[in-house]
């Protein structure tokens, strides 16, 4: 039941953020999380980190090896 609620919450967050201006990207991690970024994430090839701005406008980083898939949301 908790897994279903988490999936529904992630979908709702994705649709809510897709209404914002600009291109948003969704990153699916290896541990099952879904991260929605505001704008296109930047990959640093030297460090292997992906930098992105989260839904609250805070800059975040995640290791590239932790990201399974990254796709642009359709507007």
From Swiss-Prot:
Primary localization: membrane
Covalently lipidated residues, kind N-palmitoyl cysteine: 20
InterPro entries xref list: LSM_dom_sf, YgdI/YgdR-like, YgdI/YgdR-like_SH3-like
The name this protein goes by in its record: Uncharacterized lipoprotein YgdI
Membrane topology reported for the UniProt record: Lipid-anchor
Gene3D superfamilies: 2.30.30.100
Statement: the UniProt record of this protein carries the keyword Cell membrane: yes
Keywords, in A-Z order: Cell membrane, Lipoprotein, Membrane, Palmitate, Signal
Residue positions bearing lipid (S-diacylglycerol cysteine): 20
Pfam families given in the database record: DUF903
GO cellular component, one term: plasma membrane
Upper taxonomic lineage: Bacteria, Pseudomonadati, Pseudomonadota, Gammaproteobacteria, Enterobacterales
Similarity remark: To E.coli YgdR.
Keyword Ribosomal protein: no
Subcellular location: Cell membrane
Domain of life: Bacteria
NCBIfam families with a match to the protein in the record: lipo_YgdI_YgdR
Signal peptide boundaries: 1-19
